[in-house]
Amino acid sequence: MERRNFLRSAALAGTALFIDPQCLMARRRPDIGAWRGFNLLNYFTAGYPEPFREEEFQWMAQWGFNFVRLPLSYWNWSRPGEYYEMDEHVLQDIDRAVEWGRRYGIHVCINLHRAPGYCVNPPAEPQNIFEDAEALDGCAHQWTVFARRYRRVSSRHLSFNLLNEVARVKAEDYERIVRRLVGAIRDVSPRRLILIDGLDWGGRPLLSVPDLPDIIQCGRGYQPMLISHYEASWTFGDKPMPIPRHQLTWPLDADGRHYDRQYLLQMQEHSWTPLLQQGGRVFVGEFGCHNRTPHAVALAWLRDNLDVFRQLGWGWALWNLRGSFGILDSGRDDVEYEDFHGHRLDRQMLRLLQENL
């Protein structure tokens, strides 16, 4: 899209993207270790899109948070497999989220959770980005559109997260995709800060790209899954859980081992030390606890994770703000919720997060 057309549509949408000329010259690196925030799921799946809400940016800023990740499905602006037609109306709503982030001091990270040719969640994409050149070309095109659209927005305010939780893929194949997508972005926006999820669902780093500047690698904070995803149908299906809910604890003894804060620390250090030794940087793009885990257990587990992230100097984003992992409208049956602007607020969880800002 030509620049004049974009500026016209952005103005009609009531959104003025922030232009910071000095940022184009400076090499100031964002303090990613200080990022604290949430994932916003408004365009996480197709079929149920929900416009971003300015008041949520206001609330996050008032509570002290400074980061949001936007996990997006490209099916919201393109039809499956039709990579070169992008709905301007949806893109304008993403424009508004970027602008609200700047306005309220919240860094915005755009993530293609469902990208052309890849999604960790079902249903499968019609093409495979690791095998089909057409899908890779389409994904590169869509990132080029975002790069061009926001090329004058500082990396202090905006970053790109290429794909979500790459799994069952060889490191060399992932490297090839990363280099292609980074190249597509940097051809338009040479200094854009880019986040890449680690291999194996964000469980370990991609160690073959230390030459790429301004790259952050993203981990996860979901272990052990028995705690974070207790009775989550997309993880365990309809299988009975190995531990009854009323017997679930943190720390936890299960599978013949002991899980506690030390386990969380050792797991993260073991996974990410090789990247840190290269001078790489780590951000926890997702962590959180599903609403079927008893609330007291969830809080104890979250507290230990937050303490580990603080010890390691890592920023984090809770999955999610609103929803079964979040602080708003989480649907837990063992929480005394507080009415908050028509939402049900888990004040205890919010306070725990605020203690770790």
What are these regions (language model features)?
Residues N5-M25:
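N-terminal export signals
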Residues A133, D137-H258, E269-H290, Q311-W314:
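Active-site region of glycoside hydrolase catalytic domains
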Residues Q262-L264:
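Alpha-helical scaffold elements lining the catalytic groove of polysaccharide deacetylases
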Residues F57, V98, V182, L207, ...:
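Short amphipathic alpha-helical segments and helix-helix/interface helices
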Residues P294-L357:
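Aromatic-rich peripheral "rim/lid" segments of glycoside hydrolase catalytic domains that contact
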Residues D31-L193, G198-P205, D339-N356:
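Active-site mouth of glycoside hydrolases
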Residues D87, P126-I129, P210-P213, W234-F236, ...:
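Short, hinge-like loop/turn segments at secondary-structure boundaries
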